[in-house]
C-alpha cells in the first residue's frame, strides 16, 4: 500500500470532481490535468499542473494528442518494486503517477442524437483516455485508477483511514472495473461503426458486442439444480423490470423476474385507461380494463381465478390501497408491480410480508426501439423487439365489425401478442374471456380458450377472438361460430384466406386482417 503523491485527472463527466480533487489536494497530492478539467479545477482555486507542462510537449492536433507521452505512460506502467524499472524512469526523468481519474468522451450519448454524423461520432472516440486507463489498470499494484464518480467516496474513505494510501485489493477491483468499462466503450464504437461499413446503414453489424451488469445472484435458476444471476443493460432508460425498485417482500427469483417482465410489458400496451394483467408461467391468464384499478383487477381475476393463484399482477396506474386490499384478501400472489405505489398500498401489502411489491416508474406511450436476444446452443438470435401492433387493419368479410366489436378486437389483439404461440384470445367488453396458449394446434388453443371461459363461468357467445397468426383452414372459423364468436382479428396471409373468409361470411362473423403476425416462442 503506497501513499498517493501524484494524480492525473481528466474527465468528461465532471460530477463530483471538484470535491474529489480538493480532498486529494488536502493530502498534498500533486494534480496533473488537461483542457476543461484543468480550467475547472483552477477556477475552483485548486493548484493544477498542465500535462503539457509536465511532459514538456504541447497539446496538438486539435486536442487529439494530450497524454500520449512516455512521461505519462512510463509514470503509470513503471513498477515501483522493480529496480530496473525504477532506474530507467530516473534515467529519463519520469516521475511516478500514483492515481488516474479519467472518464471518456461521451460516444454513446453522441451517437444517440438523431442528427449525429459520422464525423461527430469519430470526434467523440476517446484515444488518450482509454490508453491511460488501461496503463493504470495494468499496473494496479502501484496505481489507483478511477473511471466512475461513484467510487470517489470509497477511495477517499480508504485514504483517510490509511494516511493517504489505497489498498491493493481496492486497486484491483477498480482495475477490473476499468477493463469492463473500456470493453463496453469499444463495443459501442464497434457496433455503431459496424452498421455503417457499406453504402447503406445495416440493420445489424457483422459483429455484436453486448455488456450487462450483474445486479443479483439468485438462490437458483428456472429449476433448483440450476445456478443463476440477473444482469441488466448498462444504461436502461425505459421503465422495466430492470429499473424497478423492490419495496418489500422476499428476494426475486429467476422465474419471478421472467414472469414480471411478461406481465409489465403486456400492461404497457394499454394507455386508454386503468388496466390489469395477471400472468402465470409467462402467459397472461387474465387481462382487463376498468373505470378504476380495482375494477380492472376484479375483471382480470375473474377470467381465470384458478390460474391467478401464485401469479404476477401488473398495473398501468399507481397502485392504491383499496386495490391492494382486494388482492391480499383474495389470493396468493408472488409479485405486484406498478409504475407507482401509494403509501396506503404499501401499508396494506406489508401485512403479507412475503409478497414482492415493485415500483418501476412510468413509461412513454411510444416505446423506444430495442433488440430482443434469444440464446441458442453456440449462437445468439437477434431481432428488433416486437413493438408494432399491426400493419393496415382492414375488414375482409361482408359484415364489418361494429364500433364496440372493433374496440374488443384491438384489445384482444394486444393481449394475443403476449401469449405463447399458438395463441387464441377470447374477449368481450374490455376483458379476456378465455386464453388458449402454447398449443401445437391453433384449433386446440381455441378449444382451451373456450374451456377456460366455461370454467370461469363466463359466456363466450357475443365475444370476439384474436389469433396471433393466420388460420390455415376454415375449421378455425367453424369452431369459432359454434362457440358464438361474433368477430375475429388475425394477420391473414394463408394460401386459404379466401376459404377462411367464406367460412366467416357463412356464419355472419365479421373478420379483419392486421397484416402483421405476432408469434411468441
From Swiss-Prot:
PROSITE patterns from the UniProt entry: MGS
One function term, GO molecular function aspect: phosphoribosylaminoimidazolecarboxamide formyltransferase activity
Taxonomic source organism: Syntrophotalea carbinolica (strain DSM 2380 / NBRC 103641 / GraBd1)
An annotated GO cellular component: cytosol
One BP term from GO: 'de novo' IMP biosynthetic process
Keywords, sorted A to Z: Hydrolase, Multifunctional enzyme, Purine biosynthesis, Transferase
PANTHER family reported in the protein's UniProt record: BIFUNCTIONAL PURINE BIOSYNTHESIS PROTEIN ATIC, BIFUNCTIONAL PURINE BIOSYNTHESIS PROTEIN PURH
Domain MGS-like: 1-147
Catalyzed reactions per annotation: (6R)-10-formyltetrahydrofolate + 5-amino-1-(5-phospho-beta-D-ribosyl)imidazole-4-carboxamide = 5-formamido-1-(5-phospho-D-ribosyl)imidazole-4-carboxamide + (6S)-5,6,7,8-tetrahydrofolate; IMP + H2O = 5-formamido-1-(5-phospho-D-ribosyl)imidazole-4-carboxamide
Stored SMART domains: AICARFT_IMPCHas (SM00798), MGS (SM00851)
Entry EC no(s): 2.1.2.3, 3.5.4.10
Protein's name in the database: Bifunctional purine biosynthesis protein PurH
Comment field on protein domains: The IMP cyclohydrolase activity resides in the N-terminal region.
Family named by the database record: Belongs to the PurH family.
InterPro entries xrefs: AICAR_Tfase_dup_dom_sf, Cytidine_deaminase-like, MGS-like_dom, MGS-like_dom_sf, PurH-like
Gene that encodes the chain: purH
Disulphide connectivity of cysteines: none
Involved pathway(s): Purine metabolism; IMP biosynthesis via de novo pathway; 5-formamido-1-(5-phospho-D-ribosyl)imidazole-4-carboxamide from 5-amino-1-(5-phospho-D-ribosyl)imidazole-4-carboxamide (10-formyl THF route): step 1/1; Purine metabolism; IMP biosynthesis via de novo pathway; IMP from 5-formamido-1-(5-phospho-D-ribosyl)imidazole-4-carboxamide: step 1/1
Amino acid at each position: 500500500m503506497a501513499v498517493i503523491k501524484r494524480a492525473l485527472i481528466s474527465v468528461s463527466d465532471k460530477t463530483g470532481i471538484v470535491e474529489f480533487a480538493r480532498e486529494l489536494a488536502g493530502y498534498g497530492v500533486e494534480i496533473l490535468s488537461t483542457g476543461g478539467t484543468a480550467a475547472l479545477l483552477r477556477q475552483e482555486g485548486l493548484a493544477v499542473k498542465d500535462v503539457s507542462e509536465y511532459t514538456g510537449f504541447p497539446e496538438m492536433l486539435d486536442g487529439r494528442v494530450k497524454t500520449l507521452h512516455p512521461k505519462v505512460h512510463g509514470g503509470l506502467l513503471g513498477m515501483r518494486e522493480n529496480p530496473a524499472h525504477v532506474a530507467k524512469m530516473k534515467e529519463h526523468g519520469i516521475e511516478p503517477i500514483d492515481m488516474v481519474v479519467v472518464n471518456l468522451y461521451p460516444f454513446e450519448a453522441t451517437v444517440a442524437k438523431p442528427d449525429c454524423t459520422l464525423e461527430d461520432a469519430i470526434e467523440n472516440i476517446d484515444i488518450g483516455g482509454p490508453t491511460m486507463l488501461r496503463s493504470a489498470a495494468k499496473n494496479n499494484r502501484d496505481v489507483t485508477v478511477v473511471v466512475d464518480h461513484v467510487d470517489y467516496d470509497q477511495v477517499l474513505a480508504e485514504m483517510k483511514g490509511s494516511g493517504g494510501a489505497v489498498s491493493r485489493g481496492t486497486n484491483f477491483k477498480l482495475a477490473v472495473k476499468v477493463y469492463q468499462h473500456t470493453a463496453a466503450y469499444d463495443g459501442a464504437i464497434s457496433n455503431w461503426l459496424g452498421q455503417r461499413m457499406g453504402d447503406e446503414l445495416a440493420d445489424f453489424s457483422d459483429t455484436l458486442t453486448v455488456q450487462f451488469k450483474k445486479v443479483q445472484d439468485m438462490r437458483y435458476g428456472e429449476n433448483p439444480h440450476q445456478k443463476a444471476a440477473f444482469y441488466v443493460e448498462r444504461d436502461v432508460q425505459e421503465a422495466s423490470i430492470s429499473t424497478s425498485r423492490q419495496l418489500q417482500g422476499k428476494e426475486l427469483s429467476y422465474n419471478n423476474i421472467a414472469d414480471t417482465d411478461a406481465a409489465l410489458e403486456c400492461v404497457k400496451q394499454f394507455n386508454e385507461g386503468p388496466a390489469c394483467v395477471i400472468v402465470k408461467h409467462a402467459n397472461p391468464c387474465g387481462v382487463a380494463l376498468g373505470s378504476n384499478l380495482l375494477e380492472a383487477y376484479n375483471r382480470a381475476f375473474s377470467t381465470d381465478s384458478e390460474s391467478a393463484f401464485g401469479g404476477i399482477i401488473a398495473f398501468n396506474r399507481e397502485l392504491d390501497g383499496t386495490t391492494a386490499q382486494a388482492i391480499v384478501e383474495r389470493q396468493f400472489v408472488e409479485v405486484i408491480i406498478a409504475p407507482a405505489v401509494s403509501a396506503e398500498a404499501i401499508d396494506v401489502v406489508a401485512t403479507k410480508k412475503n409478497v414482492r411489491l415493485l415500483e418501476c416508474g412510468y413509461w412513454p406511450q411510444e416505446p423506444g426501439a430495442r433488440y430482443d436476444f434469444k440464446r441458442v446452443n453456440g449462437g445468439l438470435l437477434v431481432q428488433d423487439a416486437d413493438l408494432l401492433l399491426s400493419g393496415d387493419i382492414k375488414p375482409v368479410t361482408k359484415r364489418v365489425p361494429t364500433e364496440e366489436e372493433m374496440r374488443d378486437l384491438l384489445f384482444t389483439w394486444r393481449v394475443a401478442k403476449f401469449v405463447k404461440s399458438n395463441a387464441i384470445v377470447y374477449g368481450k367488453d374490455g376483458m379476456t374471456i378465455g386464453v388458449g396458449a402454447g398449443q401445437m394446434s391453433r384449433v386446440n388453443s381455441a378449444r382451451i380458450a373456450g374451456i377456460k371461459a366455461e370454467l370461469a363461468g363466463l359466456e363466450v357467445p357475443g365475444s370476439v377472438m384474436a389469433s396471433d397468426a393466420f388460420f390455415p383452414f376454415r375449421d378455425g372459423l367453424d369452431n369459432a361460430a359454434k362457440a358464438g364468436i361474433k368477430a375475429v382479428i388475425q394477420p391473414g396471409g394463408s394460401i386459404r384466406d379466401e376459404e377462411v373468409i367464406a367460412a366467416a361470411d357463412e356464419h355472419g362473423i365479421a373478420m379483419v386482417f392486421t397484416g402483421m403476425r405476432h408469434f411468441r416462442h
